[in-house]
Structure formats: structure tokens, C-alpha cells
Amino acid sequence: MDKFYNYNSSSHQALLSFKVKPNSKQNLISNFVIINNIQYLKLSIKAIPEQGKANAEIINYLAKEWKLSRSNIEIIKGHTHSLKTILIKNINEDYLNLIINSYIK
């Protein structure tokens, strides 16, 4: 099974996989889901999936939740799909592990 994240220590970048549910009651990251033997973090977002509103809210929410600059968060795959790959730039591996461990129950 592929895990939901991959860290590159030479570039200090991480790729994370999310299963996004737009038009939710609240913005929330909650545990994992497995689809086609790939692990995804579940992410609920209040914004509707129209004209990039949900994607913008994903970036804003992750930046606020993880105390990162919005410019260091980029959706690189899945702009119009619920399965998204998000690039996190300029992140320390220890800090990434701290973030990840907060969602492992």
C-alpha cells in the first residue's frame, strides 16, 4: 500500500495525497481512507467546488492549520477532482512528522 505522503529531504518538500469532500459543515482533516491500495488523508472543506473556491480554501486551511505560508502550498494534481496531490515546500522533516503523527490514531 502506498502511504499518503512522500518527503524529499534534499529539497525540503513533501507530497501529500488527500481525499477532499467539499461543501462540508466544517474544515477538518480526519484520519485516512484507502482507495485502490493508496492511502489518502480525508479533508472536509466548507467551500463549494465552483470556480476554484474549494481549492483556494484547501490552501488557506492547510496554511492556517499547519502554520505555513500559503505560497508554500500548491495543488499539483486533481484541481477538478476529489483526489488531490498537494506539494508542501520549505518544510522540515521533523515538522512534517509532527503534523502527520497528529492525524494517526
From Swiss-Prot:
<comment type="similarity">
    <text>Belongs to the UPF0235 family.</text>
</comment>
<dbReference type="GO" id="GO:0005737">
    <property type="term" value="C:cytoplasm"/>
</dbReference>
<dbReference type="Pfam" id="PF02594">
    <property type="entry name" value="DUF167"/>
</dbReference>
<protein>
    <recommendedName>
        <fullName>UPF0235 protein RrIowa_1526</fullName>
    </recommendedName>
</protein>
<dbReference type="InterPro" id="IPR003746">
    <property type="entry name" value="DUF167"/>
</dbReference>
<dbReference type="InterPro" id="IPR036591">
    <property type="entry name" value="YggU-like_sf"/>
</dbReference>
